C-alpha cells in the first residue's frame, strides 16, 4: 500500500523523467547561447560593414531574427487556440499538408542544430568560401553537409516513424525557435507567458467540459497519416508500394520511454521554447550588464543587498526556477494521474523569482521597458 501511495516519487528517477529533465534544460541552455553568439556575429558584421563609412549603428538587427512585440504577445495565445481548434476538428483534412510543412521546418531547424558540428568537421579540409547554386543562393560546405544530413534524417523518420528521430527533429525546432525569436523586454515576456499560461490551463483543464474531449491531449498525441501512404493510395500504386510505412507522431513534443518500457513521458516543445525565450532574454541582459560597465549598468540596488546576491545572474536564477517548475509539474501529473498544463508551474517558478531579483537589484525598471537601449561594447565574455 505504501509503495503504491508513493509510486509518484519512484517515477521521478525513472529514465524517462530524467531524460526529459536533462534534455529540456540542455536545449534551453544551448539555444540561449546560440542566440547570444548570433548577436556577437551580427555585431561583428555591422562593425565590418560600417568601418569603411566611419559610422556604426548599434541598434541594427539581423533580418532573420523575429522580435515579438506587445501586440503579438497578446494575440499569440488566441492564434494558438484557433490553430488548436483547426487541428481538433479538421485534422483528417489538413494532416498531410501539416505533416509536410512540419517536415520542411524540421529539416531546416535540424540543419541549424547540426551546423556548428559540421563547421568543426569541415574546417580542416574545406575553406569557408561559399558555393553558388544559382537562384537558390550561396552556401558553405558546412551548410551543405548539415542540410544533407538533416534531409537524410527526415527521410528515415518518414520511413520508420521512430520516436528517437522524432525527438531529434523536435530538438532542432526547439533550438531554432529559441535562437531566432527574441523577447525585447520583461513587459513583453510577462504578457506572453501570462497569456500562454491561461491558454494552457484552459485547453488542458476545461476543454473537456465544452468539447467532451481534452483538446490539447488529443491534438498532441494524435498520429498523422504517412505522406508516402497517402501518395501511394492517390496514385493507385498497389497494396505493396508505400502501404507498410507507419503513421507519424509529429515532432511537436519530446517523448522518452520508461525503463520498463510500459509508457512514455511527454513534454510539449512549447513548454521548452516559451520559457526558453525568457531564459534567452535574461542571458542577453546579463551579457549587456557586463558589456556596460559590469554592475554599474542598472540603478543602484538597495543597501541591504549583499555582494553575493548582486553576483547571482538572472540566467542562473531563472534556470533554477525552470527546473523546480518542471519538477513540480511532473509531481502533479504523477499524483493526479492526469495531464497537467506545464506552464501553470513553469511560468510562476520562472517569472516570480526573476521579478523579485530584478527589483532587489534595482534593474526592474530598465528590464521592464528598455533593457538594451544603449550602445553595447565589444566584450564577448560571460561567466555562466
Curated annotation (Swiss-Prot):
Motif (PAL): 341-343
Record key words, sorted: Endoplasmic reticulum, Golgi apparatus, Hydrolase, Membrane, Protease, Transmembrane, Transmembrane helix
Localization terms from the record: Endoplasmic reticulum membrane; Golgi apparatus; Membrane
GO BP annotations, alphabetical order: membrane protein proteolysis; positive regulation of calcineurin-NFAT signaling cascade; positive regulation of cytosolic calcium ion concentration; signal peptide processing; T cell receptor signaling pathway
UniProt effect for mutating residue 271 to A: Loss of intramembrane-cleaving activity toward the simian foamy virus envelope glycoprotein gp130. Does not affect complex glycosylation pattern of cellular glycoproteins
Endoplasmic reticulum as UniProt keyword: yes
Sequence ranges on the Cytoplasmic membrane side: 30-74, 119-136, 186-190, 284-311, 361-384
Active site: 200, 271
Record topological domains on the Lumenal side: 1-8, 96-97, 160-164, 212-262, 333-339
Tissue-wise expression: Widely expressed. Expressed in the brain.
EC number, as in UniProt: 3.4.23.-
Regulation of its activity: Its proteolytic activity is blocked by a signal peptide peptidase (SPP) inhibitor, (ZLL)2-ketone (ZLL) or a gamma-secretase inhibitor, LY411,575. However, is not inhibited by ZLL and LY411,575 for activity on simian foamy virus envelope glycoprotein gp130.
The protein's enzyme class: hydrolase
Modification after translation: Not glycosylated.
SMART domains given in the database record: PSN
Complex and partners: Monomer. Homodimer. Interacts with STIM1 (via the transmembrane region and the SOAR/CAD domain); the interaction promotes the binding of STIM1 to ORAI1. Interacts with the simian foamy virus envelope glycoprotein gp130 and its processed leader peptide gp18LP; preferentially interacts with the envelope glycoprotein gp130.
Family: Belongs to the peptidase A22B family.
Protein name: Signal peptide peptidase-like 3
Organism: Homo sapiens
Organism lineage string: Eukaryota, Metazoa, Chordata, Craniata, Vertebrata
Gene name as annotated: SPPL3
Amino acid at each position: 500500500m505504501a509503495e503504491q501511495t508513493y509510486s509518484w516519487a519512484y517515477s521521478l528517477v525513472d529514465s524517462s523523467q530524467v531524460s526529459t529533465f536533462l534534455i529540456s534544460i540542455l536545449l534551453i541552455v544551448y539555444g540561449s547561447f546560440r542566440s547570444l553568439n548570433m548577436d556577437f556575429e551580427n555585431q561583428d558584421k555591422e562593425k565590418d560593414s560600417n568601418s569603411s563609412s566611419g559610422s556604426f549603428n548599434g541598434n541594427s538587427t539581423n533580418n532573420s531574427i523575429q522580435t515579438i512585440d506587445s501586440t503579438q504577445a497578446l494575440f499569440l495565445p488566441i492564434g494558438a487556440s484557433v490553430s488548436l481548434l483547426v487541428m481538433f476538428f479538421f485534422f483528417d483534412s489538413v494532416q498531410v499538408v501539416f505533416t509536410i510543412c512540419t517536415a520542411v521546418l524540421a529539416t531546416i531547424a535540424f540543419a541549424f542544430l547540426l551546423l556548428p558540428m559540421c563547421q568543426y568537421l569541415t574546417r580542416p579540409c574545406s575553406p569557408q568560401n561559399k558555393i553558388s547554386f544559382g537562384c537558390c543562393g550561396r552556401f558553405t560546405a558546412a551548410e551543405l553537409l548539415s542540410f544533407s544530413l538533416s534531409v537524410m534524417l527526415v527521410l528515415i523518420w518518414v520511413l520508420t516513424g521512430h520516436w528517437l528521430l522524432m525527438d531529434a527533429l523536435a530538438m532542432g525546432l526547439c533550438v531554432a525557435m529559441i535562437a531566432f525569436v527574441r523577447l525585447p523586454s520583461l513587459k513583453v515576456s510577462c504578457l506572453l507567458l501570462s497569456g500562454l499560461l491561461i491558454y494552457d490551463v484552459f485547453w488542458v483543464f476545461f476543454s473537456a467540459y465544452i468539447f467532451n474531449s481534452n483538446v490539447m491531449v488529443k491534438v498532441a498525441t494524435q498520429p498523422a497519416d504517412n505522406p508516402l501512404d497517402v501518395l501511394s493510395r492517390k496514385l493507385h500504386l498497389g497494396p505493396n508500394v508505400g502501404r507498410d510505412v507507419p503513421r507519424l507522431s509529429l515532432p511537436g513534443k519530446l517523448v522518452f520511454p520508461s525503463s520498463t518500457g510500459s509508457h512514455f513521458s511527454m513534454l510539449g516543445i512549447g513548454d521548452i521554447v516559451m520559457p526558453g525565450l525568457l531564459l534567452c532574454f535574461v542571458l542577453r541582459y546579463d551579457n549587456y550588464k557586463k558589456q556596460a560597465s559590469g554592475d554599474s549598468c542598472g540603478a543602484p540596488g538597495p543597501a541591504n543587498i549583499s555582494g553575493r546576491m548582486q553576483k547571482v545572474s538572472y540566467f542562473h536564477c531563472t534556470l533554477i526556477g525552470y527546473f523546480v517548475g518542471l519538477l513540480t509539474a511532473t509531481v502533479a501529473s504523477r499524483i493526479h494521474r492526469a495531464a497537467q498544463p506545464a506552464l501553470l508551474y513553469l511560468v510562476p517558478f520562472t517569472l516570480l523569482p526573476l521579478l523579485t531579483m530584478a527589483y532587489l537589484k534595482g534593474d526592474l525598471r530598465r528590464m521592464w521597458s528598455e533593457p538594451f537601449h544603449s550602445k553595447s561594447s565589444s566584450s564577448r565574455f560571460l561567466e555562466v
